[in-house]
Structures are given as C-alpha cells and as structure tokens.
C-alpha cells in the first residue's frame, strides 16, 4: 500500500541520517584527539604531517651533484686519451671507476628518497628516469675507459678524441640543465635550448662515428687492432646517445609541467 511504501522510505531515510550523524560524531572525536595531540606533543604531529609535504629541495641538489660527477668523469676521459702507456691508462680508468661508483651512490640515494617521499616535485618516474639516464652516461664513460685500459690499443685517433670532446660538451649542457630544473616551469626557454643542444651534439657524434668507421675498414689491416678500435669508438658513440636521452626526458618535463 501507499502507507507501507512511505513508511519504508521514511525508515530508510532515517537510517541514512543516523549513519551520517554517526560518521560526524566519529570525525568530531578524531579532530578533538588530533587537537589534543597537537597541544600535548606538537613535534610528533608535525613529524607525521611532514611526510605529506613537498620535499622538493632535496631532489634538486642530488640531481645537480650527479650531473657534476658526470662532468668530472667526462673531463677525466678526455685527459686519459692524451696518454698511451698501459700504466697511465690504467690510472685514469681507476679515477673514472671511482667517479662511476659515486654516481651509483647518488643514483641509489635518489631512488631511496623517492621511496620515502610522498609528494615529489615531478612524477616519480620522471625523477627516476632522469637519474638513471645520467647514471647511464657515467657508466658509458666508465665502459670506454675500461676498454682502453684492457685493450691498450694504438694511440686514439683524432676522431676518437673528438667524440670524447662531444661527450664533455653534452655533460656541460646537462649540468646547466640541472640548474634550471627548479625554475623551468616559469621560464622553460633555457632548458629547451639545452635539450636542443644535446640533440645537435648527438647528430655531430653520429657523423664523426660513421666517417671514422668507414675509414677504419678501408685502411686498418690489423684485424685485432680493428676490433679494439671499433669497440672503443662504438662505446664512445653509445655514450653520446645516452646523453641525448637525458635531453629527451627533460623535453618531456617541459611538455608536462612548463
């Protein structure tokens, strides 16, 4: 009947009101206890809420430090190519290996911070990828130095030295880009310019590598030496590719946030 229908609707409505009232009372009690805890132990409650506040400052210095390690490794690589003795090459490799380990330490520290920070300045994946790619460039430099030390080839040609100089140029632009990370949302012009430079340098590196490989197969008659030089040059070229990939990640940041 109509009376039964309205009675059922009334009971249903009342039950919802009672449920809402119950929730309000629970929230009210929670707020009361929270206010009491703030008064009694302000340090504890501040520490709790600090987990949910942005921790932007700590990521920027860490990324900057990682880029500085990259720059230093690129300088040592250039220096290493000026020396031909096995002992000197081994010494330079050890220096670069130490820098590679420092790069690994900073990269893992960034990953650890990502795991404990609730709010990050960019998406976690972007920070993770940026740190990983810079670490890849350092790994590439280390791989070049290792092969030079182990293979002990004839003096590196001017093309090889040119590739190492291009790697250093890319490292410098990556360092500059890290300086812009904190403010690029408002002024993305410089960061965009550095990304373009990284792309241009990588194209130059491709040209240098292709020209050298063509000449190598035309002129080198010693098969063992050919294999040594080709592999070292390939590692140098791969390292320029890794540096350009840093630029691609930075371009994505500009698209997403600027």
Regions found by a protein language model. Give the residues of each.
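Cytosolic, long alpha-helical scaffolding segments
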Residues: 1-258
């Amino acid at each position: 009947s109509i009376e039964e229908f309205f009675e059922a609707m009334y009971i249903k409505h009342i039950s919802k009101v009672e449920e809402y009232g119950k929730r309000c009372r629970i929230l009210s009690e929670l707020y009361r206890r929270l206010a009491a805890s703030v008064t009694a132990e302000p340090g504890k409650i501040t520490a709790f809420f600090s987990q949910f506040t942005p921790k932007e400052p700590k990521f920027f210095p860490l990324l900057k430090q990682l880029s500085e390690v990259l720059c230093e490794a690129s300088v040592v690589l250039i220096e290493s190519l000026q020396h031909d003795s096995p002992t000197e090459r081994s010494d330079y490799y050890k220096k670069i290996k130490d820098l590679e380990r420092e790069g690994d330490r900073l990269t893992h520290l960034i990953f650890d911070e990502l795991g404990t920070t609730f709010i990050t300045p960019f998406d976690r994946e972007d920070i993770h990828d940026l740190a990983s790619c810079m670490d890849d460039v350092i790994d590439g430099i280390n791989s070049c130095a290792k092969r030079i030390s182990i293979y002990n080839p004839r003096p590196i040609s001017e093309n090889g030295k040119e590739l190492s100089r291009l790697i250093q140029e890319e490292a410098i632009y990556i360092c500059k880009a890290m300086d812009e990370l904190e403010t690029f949302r408002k002024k993305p012009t410089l960061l965009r310019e550095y990304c373009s430079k990284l792309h241009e340098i990588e194209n130059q590196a491709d040209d240098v590598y292709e020209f050298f490989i063509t000449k190598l197969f035309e002129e080198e008659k010693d098969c063992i030496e050919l294999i040594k030089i080709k592999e070292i040059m390939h590692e140098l070229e791969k390292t320029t590719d890794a540096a350009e990939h840093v630029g691609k990640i930075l371009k994505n940041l500009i698209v997403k946030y600027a």
